[in-house]
Amino acid sequence: MARVTVEDCLEKVDNRFLLVMLASKRVKQLFKGAKPLIDNRAGNKNVVLALREIAAGKVNFEISGRKSR
């Protein structure tokens, strides 16, 4: 994946607003020292890395009893 887009992420998260919240939470985790869930040899910034992780299906979430796809 040369470029990550919102459309790539929306294949995994069906709501744009939920996607923003999920990406924000993951970026905070990365800033606090969480290990990347995908290869980051390219040295992407945390925001791009979080979106790439979501698009790759590596970030899971649950909303009040409803699990991610």
Swiss-Prot record:
Gene3D superfamilies associated with the record: 3.90.940.10
Any single biological process term in GO: DNA-templated transcription
Taxonomic lineage from the root: Bacteria, Pseudomonadati, Thermodesulfobacteriota, Desulfuromonadia, Geobacterales
GO cellular component: DNA-directed RNA polymerase complex
Role summary: Promotes RNA polymerase assembly. Latches the N- and C-terminal regions of the beta' subunit thereby facilitating its interaction with the beta and alpha subunits.
Reactions catalysed according to its record: RNA(n) + a ribonucleoside 5'-triphosphate = RNA(n+1) + diphosphate
InterPro entries, sorted: DNA-dir_RNA_pol_omega, Pol_omega/Rpo6/RPB6, RPB6/omega-like_sf
Domain of life of the source: Bacteria
Listed name of the protein: DNA-directed RNA polymerase subunit omega
E.C. number: 2.7.7.6
Record organism: Geotalea uraniireducens (strain Rf4)
Alphabetic keyword roster: DNA-directed RNA polymerase, Nucleotidyltransferase, Transcription, Transferase
HAMAP family hit by this protein: RNApol_bact_RpoZ (MF_00366)
Keyword Hydrolase included in the entry's annotation: no
Protein family according to the UniProt entry: Belongs to the RNA polymerase subunit omega family.
Keyword Transferase part of the UniProt annotation: yes
NCBIfam families: rpoZ
Record's subunit section: The RNAP catalytic core consists of 2 alpha, 1 beta, 1 beta' and 1 omega subunit. When a sigma factor is associated with the core the holoenzyme is formed, which can initiate transcription.
Gene that encodes the chain: rpoZ
GO terms of molecular function: DNA binding; DNA-directed RNA polymerase activity
Matching Pfam families: RNA_pol_Rpb6
